[in-house]
């Protein structure tokens, strides 16, 4: 799995109830044809990334088929989750 691009938006907390900053990432994912996640239309990953003081984490995510926006029922493997977390840390500024 390779991340080839992204869109990011900082989410606003209108009531100030949540600590830290939240970002919504739409990651463009390149997947090998042999991978069960592969789709001819392409695959994306929506991520809610939270940065709170020294703690960065992925709050939620899901894979989707680009074009149809159909949600795909897959989970990130541990190494992939680290890759996504690192990517979000590096690209969080809008």
Task: Identify the function of each model-found stretch.
Residues 21-29:
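A short hydrophobic beta-strand element
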Residues 30-43:
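Short, cysteine-centered beta-strand-loop-beta hairpins and adjacent loop/turn segments enriched
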Residues 4, 8, 30, 61, ...:
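Generic alpha-helix detector with strongest preference for long hydrophobic helices that associate
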Residues 7, 18, 22, 44-46, ...:
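Compositionally biased, intrinsically disordered low-complexity regions
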Residues 44-94:
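Acidic, low-complexity intrinsically disordered segments
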Residues 1-17:
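Short amphipathic beta-strand and strand-loop transition segments with alternating hydrophobic
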Residues 12-22, 35-38:
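Short, solvent-exposed beta-strand/turn "edge" segments of beta-rich domains on protein surfaces
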Residues 7, 12, 29-33, 49-53, ...:
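Beta-strand elements of well-folded, non-transmembrane domains
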């Amino acid at each position: 799995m390779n991340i080839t691009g992204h869109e990011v938006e900082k989410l606003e907390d209108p009531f100030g109830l949540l600590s830290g900053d939240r970002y919504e990432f739409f990651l463009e994912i390149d997947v090998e044809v042999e991978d069960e996640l592969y789709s001819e239309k392409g695959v994306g990953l929506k991520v809610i990334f939270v940065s709170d003081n020294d703690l960065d984490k992925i709050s939620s995510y899901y894979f989707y088929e680009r074009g149809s926006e159909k949600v795909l029922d897959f989970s990130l493997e541990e190494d992939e989750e680290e890759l996504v977390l690192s990517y979000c840390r590096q690209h969080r500024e809008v």
